[in-house]
């Protein structure tokens, strides 16, 4: 049998099963549900056709696993891993490639970036709806090392749709003067115009000799939302200001606050003393809905009554001084209070 190469058709790839060989792929929809750092990556799909190549499959797994290549951060290149596989030399570059006729996928550095691709990670459905499990189990050639910490949290797009995000930070360098971590961000809901990439951001975190956060080379995440009517990309900033680089037994990372929210409806509103009308929504969010404006006159006695508790500027009232409650000697507002009646009972009777 010939060894596979990048241009080999997927339907021609054979995998040994005991004393026989069987096709590793068949035409249909291939579903991939791998794991990284012990956490599920989410399910991505790849259409296997008669013209699909091994390189197409490699690109799919690399993108669906969130493996970030050296070129993604040109200013601060992503590091390769030290190669400790017996009989091999050179670094292990993150990504997918063919090694001695076998497929190999190298994750990014850090224990929580380690890929797990077993038999249960794949399902393929043919045109008739028959579902099978292809013989595509991957073993581990080198265990992942490197102190890591990860945090899973939810953000919301412009329609209030919840989006899962995972940020993993891995120790990259430590000197007498500083500690450097690299963070990687993944989102299974990332929907690029083409492809299945779940990687949505990366950058470096610098800490000084006292463990204090100094700076980040990048603090923004961008999640593509093609195929849905949400604003695309969904962009937000990570605040690393409360993260420290102190030495601990187990590194940890957590998202403590975010300013997005799920959809909500207006439940009630309140009026503040400054005239601000603030809405209270079912999702716990409060937002300013409007602003009351008041006016005062030099001669309020000259106001002309228009009925229904309404008055208009008169000839000798002077010009109105308008503003928010409490400004420029203007009266105040008491929320929830009832106005005293100014009805002339004697006249009305």
Task: Show where each model-derived region lies.
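S/T-rich, low-complexity, solvent-exposed segments of bacterial secretion/appendage proteins
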Residues: 1-349
